[in-house]
């Protein structure tokens, strides 16, 4: 396995033979599924989850949530495995809690019914591309289906990992579906025109991407991916993570050839901020990525008369300003087309993921980190955690067996 596994969010545009027709408020069109009501088998161990999915996804939104992996609907070139029942339950309730319920809260009554994917297919294992050093986190197909991978690694105790693998992926792929319904402004495609590279983004560090005006390396692969990455990252990144991204984006970054031993000699104390950080790529190349500043003939930092680092911007590109410009376009697009305020969505996502004080401000632990709400006593029943309370949405259906 390679030393570093790049993350790939792959968007598959599947051409549907009958074409794609957007729905109007007056006519949502017929269901794409067999609409006959088949009674669920109460003798099955999975009856509670099957009932939950029927009541919360199929009936209100015409969404078929598939957790029993279907080979014919999977990547047949990969060795994939199904999601466990336990992880399927967790992902299902979190999908409702952190995705559907929030858009239901701030969208129009028909927003999800019109724009939701018709199929959500959950796979238990990772989808790896070893030859490319990439990993497929999710796939959106033809505006109808979203496939999510790696469900068996879902860990509600680790929100960063959970967002990266699942909820950023959900918002990313959902953004593609919305972009097919109301195309993004053509002006967006021009902001970073000439800077997209579909072949080299996998080796682009986060800081370099940010300095160029991209919220993630993958955003630098194509304008369409840039658009949905802005949406997904803004919604799922917490306030500390977003602030760190914007700080990195405020600088110009450069790539320097440097061995690990040379880097170790230089990266000490206050020099660390100007030396940057070391990284060894899949092909064995050793690189250092550092902020651009004035340097002397020996490549050491040249301080000004007051002893301060002289940060430089040789390209004239201000990554933080570019990211905010892109975000404003996404904000206006959601507001103009669906009357949805992305800041309301983001605020509610974070409120459901992290502990807050009575005044709505976030709570921090003694190390200055946000506190995971899912692992804390729930508001509804303090004797159990929020995650345990959400799981009861499913287990409560056992009473019907």
What are these regions (language model features)?
Residues 28, 89-145:
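Auxiliary, metal-adjacent structural segments of Zn-dependent hydrolase domains
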Residues 160-185, 228:
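Active-site recognition of the HExxH zinc-binding catalytic motif
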Residues 96, 100, 104, 175-183, ...:
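Sec-exported extracytoplasmic/periplasmic mature domains
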Residues 196-340, 345, 352-401:
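Metalloprotease/metallohydrolase-associated module, dominated by Zn2+-dependent proteases
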């Amino acid at each position: 396995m390679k030393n570093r596994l790049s993350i790939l969010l792959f968007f598959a545009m599947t051409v549907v033979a009958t074409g794609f027709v957007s729905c109007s408020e007056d006519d949502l069109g017929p269901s794409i599924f067999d609409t006959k009501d088949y009674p669920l088998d109460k003798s099955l161990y999975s009856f509670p989850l099957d009932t939950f999915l029927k009541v919360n996804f199929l009936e209100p939104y015409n969404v078929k949530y598939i957790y029993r992996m279907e080979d014919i609907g999977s990547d047949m070139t990969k060795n994939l495995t199904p999601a466990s029942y336990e992880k399927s339950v967790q992902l299902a309730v979190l999908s409702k809690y952190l995705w559907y319920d929030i858009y239901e809260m701030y969208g129009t009554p028909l927003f999800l019914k019109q724009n939701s994917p018709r199929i959500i297919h959950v796979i238990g294992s990772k989808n790896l591309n070893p030859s490319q050093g990439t990993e497929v986190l999710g796939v959106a197909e033809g505006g109808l289906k979203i496939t999510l991978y790696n469900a068996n690694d879902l860990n509600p105790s680790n929100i960063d990992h959970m967002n990266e693998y699942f909820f950023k992926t959900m918002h990313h792929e959902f953004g593609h579906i919305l972009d097919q319904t109301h195309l993004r402004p053509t002006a967006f495609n021009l902001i970073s025109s000439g800077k997209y590279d579909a072949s080299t983004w996998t080796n682009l560090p986060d800081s370099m991407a940010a300095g160029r005006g991209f919220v993630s390396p993958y955003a630098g692969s194509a304008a369409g991916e840039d658009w949905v990455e802005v949406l997904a990252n803004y919604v799922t990144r917490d306030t500390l993570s977003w602030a760190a991204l914007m700080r990195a984006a405020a600088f110009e970054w450069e790539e320097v050839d440097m061995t690990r031993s040379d880097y170790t000699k230089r990266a000490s104390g206050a020099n660390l901020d100007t030396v940057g950080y070391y990284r060894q790529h899949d092909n064995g190349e050793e690189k250092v990525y550092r902020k651009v500043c004035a340097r002397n003939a020996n490549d050491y930092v040249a301080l000004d008369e007051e002893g301060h680092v002289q940060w430089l911007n040789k390209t004239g590109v201000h990554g933080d300003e570019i990211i905010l410009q892109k975000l404003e376009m996404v904000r206006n697009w959601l507001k103009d087309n669906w009357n949805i305020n992305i800041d309301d969505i983001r605020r509610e996502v974070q409120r459901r993921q992290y502990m807050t004080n009575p005044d709505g401000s976030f709570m921090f632990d003694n190390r200055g980190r946000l506190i995971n709400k899912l692992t804390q006593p729930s508001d509804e029943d303090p004797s159990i955690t929020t995650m345990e309370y959400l799981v009861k949405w499913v287990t409560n259906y056992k009473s019907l067996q």
